[in-house]
Structure formats: C-alpha cells, structure tokens
Amino acid sequence: MNTFADYILEEEELGSKMEIAYYLSKKEKVFFDKSIVFKTEIARLFLNYSKIEVDKNFVLTACLLCNCKKVDNAQDINKIHTYAKEGADYLREMGFGKRFCKVCEEINRYSNSNPRERESDILELVDQFGGMLLDRPERIGFKPDEALVLLEHRNLKDEYNRYLHTFIEFVNFLEKIQINDLVSMTALRRLVKIHNETEELTKFIQKVVYEFEPKIDKLIAEQNEEIAEEMFSKVEDANRPLFSEETTRKIMAHIHDDPRMKQEGQV
C-alpha cells in the first residue's frame, strides 16, 4: 500500500504537488501557508538557473514539507529551535525516507546535524532569503539586495553554505528580469506583490503556477538568449587569419633576417 510520501513524491507537476500539501495541512493541521508556496517558487527558479545536480522533484517536495511543524509565532523561541527536528520526525511517520527527513531537519542548524546534505543548503538559502522578502508583524519585507547582504553577512556569517555565492548570482540575475503588466517591476517584486495581494492560499497557488511561472520562464529564456547572442557577437569570425596581412609580412621579414632560422634551414 502506498504511503503519503509515495503519493506526493510520485506527483511531478508542481501545482498538483502544492495542492496535495495543502490538503494535508487541512487534514493533519500541519503548517502550510502562502510563504511556503512563495519560497518553493524561488527554489524552482534557483534550480532551473543553477543546474545543480540534485533531484529537483525531491528538493521541491522537501521545500513544501520541511516547515510542517513550524508555528507562526516568532516569539516562541523554543519552538523555533525544535520545529525542524519535530517536522522530520513527523515526516518519517508519514513514510518518508531517512535521507529526505534529514534534509528537512537541516533547513536550519539548530539540531546540529552534520555533515549537512547538499539539498539542505538549498532549502536553507531559499527559506531565509524568501522569508526576509515578506512582511512580518514586526517589520516590512526587505528588498532583495538588502536581504542578500543580511543573508551573507549576518545569517550565514559564521556558517558554510556550498551554494551561497551561486544563489547570490541567481538573485542578481533575477533582478534584471522585468515583468510588464500595468506597471513594470522586477520578477521578485512581482512575486512579492502577488503574495501580498492574494488572500486565499489556493488562489495564490493558481496565480503562481498558471500565471507567474509561464511568464517568468519565458522572460528568463529570452534573457538567456540575449546573453548568448551578445557573447557570440563578441567572437570574431573563426576563419579570420590569426595575423593581419601587414603583421604577417613583418613576421616573415623578421624570420628571413634571423640567422638562427637560416642555420636551421627554415628559410
């Protein structure tokens, strides 16, 4: 008999996977809100950009479920320190494998689990960066460049994350992508705007999967094409002689006058 773990891992379409996680949250009272969908979309974009050799389906499923025992209360310090471990234990009961649960536990570093899995480093970056972009009761969301500075020089100042610099490159790349609707704005700002203006979780999922994703994927493809064309335009004709005709004459004259060449019988 298939477990819940089998069911959600076998579903490779991200929108359907999000719906499964949503219905689990209703049945089991686990944590699943718009911020999870928001962060998972950032994870999807990062995986597409970076081409890191990981199982994309595995990572996105973990991104949807790793916060399952989180509480929406920043003042509950004890819970902040334990929710990742509690979530991993819960997911193990739901049929997920040991490594999947370890990856979810390592979304933060409170359990001191080492050595860290590489997928955990992806979850950590997405969770911390994505969280800083969103408003919280005690503060408004940070701009992407501000969030990157805090991520690198505060949150991970004394920690090693193998994908940090790749993630910074990814965010800087994404900040160059403009989405034009009624008002032109960057891709991340647009995603934040959709998050803030869409109250219902199910509607937010639909807007992300069926409106935002096709648009941003097309724009990224166009941006990559422009970059490739720019690179190729800088490459001169491969059949062009290495030296100009004038340079060739000078070199040949020099060789002709060089006594070493005459001694070796090359002239």
Please annotate each region the language model reported.
Residues 1-92, 253-267:
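Acidic/His-rich, divalent-metal-binding segments that scaffold phosphate/diphosphate chemistry
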Residues 59, 63, 91-126, 130-237, ...:
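Histidine/acidic-rich helix-loop-helix segments that form or flank divalent-metal centers
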